[in-house]
């Protein structure tokens, strides 16, 4: 699945004010888990916005590609993911949201992924998760981390403004539909997703909210979500949606699964979770999904990266996660 990066060696044309050298320097700095300066974050977000605003609500993605679930600020595990799956730009990646909150290094994690997007716009796709929102990040850690590392909320504002431009979903070779959460009773076609106005804070209800918050369920039909946003949807719903839209699979993230991936709805839906030992205590494996150039699918599972300088937390499984 290695790809010759020669055709993607130039910086996104919209990002010419940030030189190739600038962005390469940012990436190397971030790979050492060293946060960028506030001024560099501002420039990064300004230039990344110019790239992301050109992308679609249903962003087309070519194979081969590696599909990833939640990261949640677990920076060293993101480095492990690239070690297992291959580095950018040698491999194509599709991340399905939730880069921030809960982990210790949300700033470095989201900065690196956005810098990679700016440097190699055709090699990496970054979708929006329910945690890429102003309201959620004020509760679950990213806001506080920005205050602690920068002394003000400016970096948080730069990133949360940028989150409004992240694509909502992606479509691999017209066959695999990828999104953070799940389906919506308001949406029966990909064309409907394409018409949504995504450049806004994640709403509390409605189709955009549902795409980022919903979960598959064993019960048929639509159900009330215990999360307080989105819906649960049954096998009948996903089967109908996939068939109506010519899809072979809906891939999503959003839920902790102990093996890193979990099939549901008789193979119509798969959940991918890419944060091993979630919250540094859950004991789960992580996984990524490799889709090759013939659309064959292989899951790669991985364990946490060795930890340095982080507190050891006794493992326990919380009752519920957002």
From Swiss-Prot:
Single annotated GO MF: metal ion binding
GO cellular component: chromosome, centromeric region; cytoplasm; cytosol; nucleus; protein phosphatase type 2A complex
Keyword Manganese: yes
UniProt keyword Protein biosynthesis present: no
Cofactor note: Binds 2 manganese ions per subunit.
Superkingdom to which the source organism belongs: Eukaryota
Name under which the protein is recorded: Major serine/threonine-protein phosphatase PP2A-2 catalytic subunit
Gene label: ppa2
